[in-house]
Every structure is written in structure tokens, then in C-alpha cells.
């Protein structure tokens, strides 16, 4: 029986985490005796840093690979891996692959959609509670050693509008419902109401402004595609309540940041919680750093202590399907972009 060559390229190349990749490689190898796994993580980082000879060494591994499991992969992957048939990324979002040579190729692309729902759902609630309970104000008063009393808000009976009802959007809806909130959402198709169990009002994507106008919190949980790039701009901010906050845990490019800054300056909205920005890291001279009503986190909402295990569990489940000729989970529709 012919061997199946798998190349792993993970971000877990830190010398302080020597067990990370070893555990991943062992787990993948245990799926089948046919599997032959090699680790290209260190070489991929070396190539990124421009270290001499690293590209040639990585090319030797890529040339053998039929399957690649990883993150931060080379943009010319298809050209360098002629035997490649399937790539599974360790992320849910696949927008970075749209500029690689596998996007318009027969190579199957899958992601790990679903594993982020719990940590990101909690992160969204954290943002909402911080705004409702005025946590940024509390932190500033503590730093100034000031005892300034204020009136906190509550989430109960407030309306949350979720833009995008995938696994993350559905988990946000479930958590918000537990807080006694009214839940609205938009999605491309409203033909599957069973997927909207915790949603009080489901709207097609074309009725976004209605959702914006009724929401106290707007949560961006849609992938970045040609359709959603710049989805939230000046007109959308004008449609929002001046007391509403926007939270983005999708991709930075979904929000027009210049329009967001103008909306904050004009007090068209009450605040923004941003785990993602158009440029990452956020440039030091960005004005977004300086607003009292903007909470910034460095694209970490999807993280959790055992992230790599969850991601690799899903890859191994897909690997079993691949070996048995079954349809893979989380196959990316390259025309739609997710």
C-alpha cells in the first residue's frame, strides 16, 4: 500500500515548547500505518527570515507532500508542491489563501471552522460586558487612584445584532440568549431556520441596515470575502444607534476603519471592541489606540489553552475520511471565499 506523505507546518516552533510539534506528529501518525509525517515548521520560519539554504531544504519536503496541515504557508505552495492534493489550515478564516496559487487550483482546501466558537463567543460577551459595566472607565479611575462612582448598565433586554450566523455567530446567539437579550442576525440564506435556534429575528444579508438600526451591540462574525470587504462603512455607522457599540471578531477589512474613526469622532456610535484590524499589528500611529471607548485586543479571541489539540483532532478526523475516500469536513467553497 502506497504511503501518504503529510507535511506539518505549525506556528508551534518556539524552543520553549519542544513537545508541541512532537505531540502533533505522533497524533497524526497514529491515524494509519500508511501515514508518513514530516515537520517543516522550523524550515518555514527560517525561510521567512531569509536564512540561507532554508528554501531549498523546505522545497525537498514540499516536493514529497500530498497533504499539508499548517498555518502561514508559502504563497507559491502549489508551484513548489507538485504532488499536493489537500491543504488543511489551522485557522477558520481562509482569506489569506485567496492570494496564493492554490486558490485557483484543484487542491482541496479545508479549515478548522467550529473549534473557535467557544473562545470567541466568550470573548464577544467579554467585550459586551466591559462596555455595559464601563470597565475601561474603571481601569482609568484605578490608574488615577480615583474613587468615581457611576451607574453600570445591564445586557438583559438589550438587542444584539449578529452579522453572520456561522458556528461563531450561533454560539454568540446562544450566550446572549442566556443573558436575556433579544437576538437578531443576518445571514446569506434564511432558508435553514433550524440553524437559528437562539435568534429572535433572522434577516437576509440585504437587510443589514435594519439590524444595525435596532441593535445595542453589533457583532461582526462573518468571514472576509469580496462581498464583505468594507461591508461596514459610513452609511452603516449612520444607521446605528448613537448608544450602540460595534464588536469585530471577524476580519479587520470588514470595517472601513477611516469611517469608524469618523463615526467615533462624531459620536455616531458609543464604542468599538476590535480583536481584528485592517493592518495587523495595528500601526503605532493609528488613532484607534487613543479612544477611551475603543477596546483593542491583538487578534487573540480564537485562542485557548489546548487550541492545537482541538485543531489536530479535527485534522485527524478529516485524514481518516481522506484515507477512506469520504467527503472532507469544512471544505472551502473558493467561489464564495469560505
Language model feature labels by segment:
Residues 64-139, 153:
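Phosphate/diphosphate ligand-binding glycine-rich loop within oxidoreductases
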